[in-house]
């Protein structure tokens, strides 16, 4: 078929044209020519066609050179491109990021005339011996649609960018050199079904493979594991589809490594009568029974290998296929999702396939790294948001142990209403094809415990059809789907998005009750697992611990999948060579959703966000409780929340801290069965000091390395405050003379007797303009009131320049002028006391002709160089909740000491509604490490519960929260990327009395819980500052 005929057909604008001449979907095939090879997974008859292909991008399909499909076509002037890759990241076209919006006019099934089209050419050489077998080409992923030619002949067409397209090339190939030509179209009718929250990228982005199979071969294998009613003995139901005479035989055997577990089972077609018309002549049904197999779970990923062989009528071996299998049984029973008869608690995360340099291309190394990180941070489940992943991903989840919710490549979020296509019979074939082909490909993986019909496509007749087919074809797994309200008849699991723990999310169309209420609705017996929750956009995840308190309290609340795993930033460099992570709009894509793709728990390079520590803590598998304490010992109860394994590889390490410094430590081995407890007694062997604070830390550590973590890895932590029964000591009272007080013009001068410490206030500004110690300045900027924070993503919400949300925190703060108030010094007075000098400054803050706040600063200075600051704050009644109440000053940047040491909560960033994982102690970090480089710059680096702080040349004492940074709040507010920030030669020290929470139930509504909002009208706080090495 000529290219002009293909153009005229316009398959890419026809929802009925899904796959033309593609082979039926099936489980992955390898075609081993020996049973032992199949058992060992070696010498598969698969040849990778990855590598350098010739490439040229055209503006539209109509502009493609018609001769490019010909063998003789001269492609020497074309460029080279790596396969697999996304062409936008190879120097062609531009990436587009959109969350909801389609990046083209919505008129299904039609797509823009401006439709970039990438043409690929490559060559492969085959021998006469090769041609004796059938040769199949497999494209594991092409976005979004493509036509294929071989030696100038049209082979076929496919769309669905996340599933394989497989063609039989046998009739087109010749001995010697062969030419393949592929025309990939960026926009197709399939794009309407792929409106996921990710980058729109194009090209051949997954592997291309040539599979050689004998003419008589195995076409598909479906293996269904099961356990008996006692969950003890196992069975494997094996259904094999063959392309061979009905006299052929299928030989099946199960192996554990090289050891055969079962005797061979041999059967022929027609061995099961299907209905009154008879049986299949190309399908063989077999069952293997195994006594007490080692069961597969994410905690104990025990795998066996099934080898399925095709024999001719005389018993001669023709071909083998092999699959890793796990004995496990998934059920929704007694209102819970159960595995092997026990309820699960899903510690899950949504994961996009994203690489900062390669886009949607994932290497095995990338996949293993993600899985190891997930396991290290106590995840046990992953949702393939929102499409089937690379085939290798599932094999690795089988091997390392992760539960998988496998999701169909269907999302129509940008349609109005969302279910417009879901309810349209013209699109039913496309829906069914995407779902059934996913199930057919992935059906043998034990890690997949839930099928998902897709994401955010409303609820329509196509969902009911997919659900019905799934329950008939694979009743061994539950189905979930959130669209249409999370509890429709097309889901076995209530799976809402962003439902809160205790409050209702108002929505006229679909219910979003609090999760506690949802499971108590009349006649509702399904489990609830949040398909998305805890929106981790930037500095977020406030109140995450509340979800986990609820999950542990209510058995039918069985966890959820956090949104989401990785920031989808793309590596870019500015004109000065500074690296930054790009997001929507950075490539000239005018239809975009800006940084809404930056909502992961880890940075694009897989560096964890601080929020991941909170997740790790809340999701810990082993918990410790302090049940009793007396003078001699502490009594601990250690609970093993693993469902299927004992603590045979864990030790408990403990330490006692005195004012944050370790004074005693020890360890003990844990021997706790799954779901059980152990009591641990710790003898206290130290003499408590009066007025000291004592804490007990516990760490759960791995004894031996696992495939996903090194020996010594800390999987769980706790901290307990110990009571101190020692008598209080009387404070030492020193009789000191007061510093010298004088006035010079409009300045107030204070100095101690030896002139070592000198302070100066300007009466007109009311500010401390100078603080000298031994002739060296302590300050670069005077301490000032600080009510503002550089807005977080959660503060901004959906507000944009052209789409203002008046309810967003940033808009409410802006309307109140917070951050722009004009300061007026009402008065600045001083007086000399018997042992100190007191300076009092009163400030009024004006905006729009009214006073918004009044603050009174009282400085008390003694002869030892200590400066005590008491601040009284009064706010106007009409103000919104404030971002923070505190002060800010700037210190000189020391040349020899850029570390920060504090006693308080840490060591990582923590905020008032996200500090469950933080521990009290003495912590030291570099100055640079105190700043979190969020891709979209915001306030960061806060540490709470602080008693004292050493930074630069200053020591601070009190009860406060703080952050230090070399970036001003103005820089952090104005910058849109990290490369726009310039390190300043000073240290900004922000000391807060109170700081608003970060929120995180979602990122588009004001989600900071009321108890973490600053709603009072008056505040009072104190801080003591003095020079270090005083």
From Swiss-Prot:
GO terms for biological process: lactose catabolic process. GO terms for cellular component: beta-galactosidase complex. GO terms for molecular function: beta-galactosidase activity; carbohydrate binding; magnesium ion binding. It catalyses: Hydrolysis of terminal non-reducing beta-D-galactose residues in beta-D-galactosides. The active site is at residues 456, 532. Keywords: Glycosidase, Hydrolase, Magnesium, Metal-binding, Sodium. The keyword Cell inner membrane does not apply. SUPFAM superfamilies: (Trans)glycosidases, beta-Galactosidase/glucuronidase domain, Galactose mutarotase-like, Galactose-binding domain-like. Transmembrane segments: none annotated. InterPro entries: B-gal_small/dom_5, Bact_Beta-galactosidase, Beta-gal/glucu_dom_sf, Gal_mutarotase_sf_dom, Galactose-bd-like_sf, GH-type_carb-bd, Glyco_hydro_2, Glyco_hydro_2_AS. Its cofactor is Mg(2+); Na(+). Binds 2 magnesium ions per monomer. Na(+) binds at residues 197, 596, 599. The keyword Magnesium applies. The record marks 352, 386 as: Transition state stabilizer. Belongs to the glycosyl hydrolase 2 family. PANTHER family: BETA-GALACTOSIDASE. This is Beta-galactosidase. It comes from Photobacterium profundum (strain SS9).
